Amino acid sequence: MLLEKAYRIKKNADFQRIYKKGHSVANRQFVVYTCNNKEIDHFRLGISVSKKLGNAVLRNKIKRAIRENFKVHKSHILAKDIIVIARQPAKDMTTLQIQNSLEHVLKIAKVFNKKIK
């Protein structure tokens, strides 16, 4: 199941605005940019996985794992624009490892509205 269109960031102008005005947090596997957006009452997600990470199958696997993590925590995420950039070490991780690493960096970025186990 996909995230609905309202939850996606697709336009380059939106990505550039978040890169410039947003706050970034990183760990070895991911960089997360967050930016407040008062126009909406839910989060929006943009995902960037470079071609340097591998072929399309691998890049799509990483993107699916990231989207799945956001779907699981959908009700606990604050209304912000969020961009997740996958780094090189993410290509060697399992889906569970991606989930744990992403949750770790999202907690640091303070995008959850309450404690997540």
UniProtKB/Swiss-Prot annotation:
InterPro entries according to UniProt: Ribosomal_Su5_D2-typ_SF (IPR020568), Ribsml_uS5_D2-typ_fold_subgr (IPR014721), RNase_P (IPR000100), RNase_P_CS (IPR020539)
Top-rank lineage group of the source organism = Bacteria
Q: What is its EC number?
A: 3.1.26.5
Annotated keywords: Endonuclease, Hydrolase, Nuclease, RNA-binding, tRNA processing
Enzymatic class: hydrolase
Pfam families for the chain: Ribonuclease_P
Q: Where are the transmembrane segments?
A: none
Keyword Membrane found = no
Q: One GO cellular component from the entry?
A: ribonuclease P complex
The catalysed reaction is: Endonucleolytic cleavage of RNA, removing 5'-extranucleotides from tRNA precursor
Q: HAMAP family from the entry?
A: RNase_P (MF_00227)
Concerning its family, UniProt says: Belongs to the RnpA family.
The role this protein plays is: RNaseP catalyzes the removal of the 5'-leader sequence from pre-tRNA to produce the mature 5'-terminus. It can also cleave other RNA substrates such as 4.5S RNA. The protein component plays an auxiliary but essential role in vivo by binding to the 5'-leader sequence and broadening the substrate specificity of the ribozyme.
Q: What is this protein called?
A: Ribonuclease P protein component
Originating organism: Staphylococcus aureus
